[in-house]
Amino acid sequence: MDEKTKKAEEMALSLARAVAGGDEQAAIKYATWLAEQRVPLRVQVKPEVSPTQDIRLCVSVEDAYMHTVTIWLTVRPDMTVASLKDMVFLDYGFPPSLQQWVVGQRLARDQETLHSHGIRRNGDGAYLYLLSARNTSLNPQELQRQRQLRMLEDLGFKDLTLQSRGPLEPVLPKPRTNQEPGQPDAAPESPPVGWQCPGCTFINKPTRPGCEMCCRARPETYQIPASYQPDEEERARLAGEEEALRQYQQRKQQQQEGNYLQHVQLEQRSLVLNTEPTECPVCYSVLAPGEAVVLRECLHTFCRECLQGTIRNSQEAEVACPFIDSTYSCPGKLLEREIRALLSPEDYQRFLDLGVSIAENRSTLSYHCKTPDCRGWCFFEDDVNEFTCPVCTRVNCLLCKAIHEHMNCREYQDDLALRAQNDVAARQTTEMLKVMLQQGEAMHCPQCRIVVQKKDGCDWIRCTVCHTEICWVTKGPRWGPGGPGDTSGGCRCRVNGIPCHPSCQNCH
């Protein structure tokens, strides 16, 4: 489009605005110019020249990287494109010089209205393309000046220049008085102090951590000038940021102290109770807050009765969590203080006695007092030959594994051999056990060497003395030295899907 055609369109639009506004002198002026230029026009009366009701405009926004998003703007059909650019700038921070609007499949100019492009009802669409700002230098003063010029154009003042009061005569430049020949007129304007946003190129103040327009972070390589002095606005902002940081640190400290006190109070309790309604996975009872116990190690929740029954029926010193389903068996253990809080004093003492008995039976260096019904026992070493029971005070011989007071070891063993020849019942029992061992109906425990027998069922048995799990078909321990689940030793049944023996009947 050449300059003459562009000027004619601007004069035609100015004529339309002057007629719509009732400005006769301006209308005569614009009509006279158009007539002198012999510009062909088409005049059409519109029933609604300047509608003022608000409508919803659907805008598709695209940037230089082909990123697209749809937004909705509340506008009026009589708004100019310049006013629309200002609205987007105020709402989203994109300067007007970076906005390129396409309405009705053609580029829209600033002085044109939305109504002239067919934007008249809700749902009408427009397209906004955001230009790259890398080659543009923007600052607050320039943005404010451009906005004021667009507001003046909307009011009908175009190409406005300020004239001084007085006669319209050219003012001659003042002669130089105290200036040497060759001296420059004025120092060049210093560049604005601050950092340029890499996204929208807005010049921000040095102390600002993010762009005031698009909130992009300040470049890491930027250094605040050492001689820079913040103005009053910056000092107020910095003081506000310091106060907000101080309040944040104070609230964080208070929250940490509160959490610490809460953990201390919780740690001082023997049992952790539930805070929400739950269901016991064992008996399926619905439990209100405070009625169930949450295990500390695995966080599973049960009623007190089910946990008490689990502890009483446990054959191990460490009580396992009773949670189990079709795919998972919890390996967690109940803590000692949880067990003590759940049981009565009598039941807790029995539980401790069970643990002591298990520890005694599983040790190869333990010895139990031979006095009938005496509970005394000890761990012995190789250089110790006698054990004085602290319960019955009898002296046990660790070499003979018996009590033979007033006799030495040789005298006791000779007497024992003599009595064995005359004891028919003892001899018959010994012969029967030998036959059972030879025929495979019994075996020695691989841990404590007592004779154990399988009555029926699968090939898994447990020693009644040391509680060692035994594989009957291999005549050895079921698990490795690590206990249940350790397949580094034992019979290693079902490892890689292979049974431990061709005759295995499931030693689980």
UniProtKB/Swiss-Prot annotation:
Signal sequence, renumbered to the chain: none
Amino acids binding Zn(2+) 2: C298, H300, C321, C330
Reactions performed catalytically: [E2 ubiquitin-conjugating enzyme]-S-ubiquitinyl-L-cysteine + [acceptor protein]-L-lysine = [E2 ubiquitin-conjugating enzyme]-L-cysteine + [acceptor protein]-N(6)-ubiquitinyl-L-lysine
Description of the deletion phenotype: Impaired TNF-alpha-mediated NF-kappa-B activation and enhanced JNK-mediated apoptosis.
Stretches assigned to coiled coil: 231-259
Domain of life: Eukaryota
Keywords assigned: Acetylation, Coiled coil, Metal-binding, Phosphoprotein, Repeat, Transferase, Ubl conjugation, Ubl conjugation pathway, Zinc, Zinc-finger
Annotated function: E3 ubiquitin-protein ligase, which accepts ubiquitin from specific E2 ubiquitin-conjugating enzymes, such as UBE2L3/UBCM4, and then transfers it to substrates. Functions as an E3 ligase for oxidized IREB2 and both heme and oxygen are necessary for IREB2 ubiquitination. Promotes ubiquitination of TAB2 and IRF3 and their degradation by the proteasome. Component of the LUBAC complex which conjugates linear ('Met-1'-linked) polyubiquitin chains to substrates and plays a key role in NF-kappa-B activation and regulation of inflammation.
Full protein name: RanBP-type and C3HC4-type zinc finger-containing protein 1
Source organism (scientific name): Mus musculus (Mouse)
Record lineage: Eukaryota, Metazoa, Chordata, Craniata, Vertebrata
